A protein has these predicted regions:
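Acidic/glycine-enriched connector segments
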Residues: 1-121, 126-179
């Protein structure tokens, strides 16, 4: 199985790890139902030109085509998967399992034609963790870089502390459900 690393940033705040993740990948992939949230605007600013937005409501095959064009244009082999958290996505009818499946289908299709060597994310619920789930299920090395103490925002918009072991077990369980 691929390497799955769960690490924490030195800051308790979300923005510092957003900047590190965006600047450490060839391309940042924002997966969202609302691209106007503070987090999405920060992610786009941090990624600069190395950014592609994939609307979650779209067909996974159409999203894969859009992502494939972006990775080919930049010859991107490392991705930062970002996007809305589950608290935003749930308001639009999305469960974490459904997001995981959608992201897995998109990345899996691109990976067949343009191999991805590494995926990183901020590990938040919703799109971020779905990127790690997809990477692990597809055999792609991956890293979740969380705020200090592995903060995650819940469906109720509350920040909770997790352990690296809890997060790793959750990712592996969801990935097993995809393959």
């Amino acid at each position: 199985m691929p390497s799955l690393r769960i690490e924490q940033h030195e800051s308790h705040r979300y923005p510092p790890r957003t900047w590190v993740n965006a600047q450490s990948a060839d391309l940042t992939v924002a997966i969202a139902v609302d691209f106007t949230t503070k987090g999405e605007l920060l992610t786009k600013r941090a990624a600069g030109a190395a950014f592609v937005a994939l609307p979650l409501e779209g067909d996974p095959l159409d999203a894969a085509r859009l992502l494939w064009k972006a990775v080919r244009q930049r010859d991107a082999r490392t991705l930062n998967i970002a996007g809305n958290g589950i608290c935003t996505m749930a308001k639009h009818g999305w469960s974490q399992e459904r997001i995981n499946t959608w992201v897995y289908q998109v990345i899996g299709k691109v990976h067949q034609h343009h191999p991805i060597s590494f995926i990183r994310s901020g590990g938040q619920t919703g799109a971020d963790i779905a990127g790690l789930v997809a990477a692990y299920a597809l055999g792609i090395e991956c890293l979740g870089l969380y705020p200090k103490r592995f903060l995650q925002r819940t469906i109720d918009n509350l920040d909770v502390r997790r352990s690296a072991e809890e997060i790793e077990a959750e990712i592996k369980s969801w990935a097993a459900g995809l393959v």
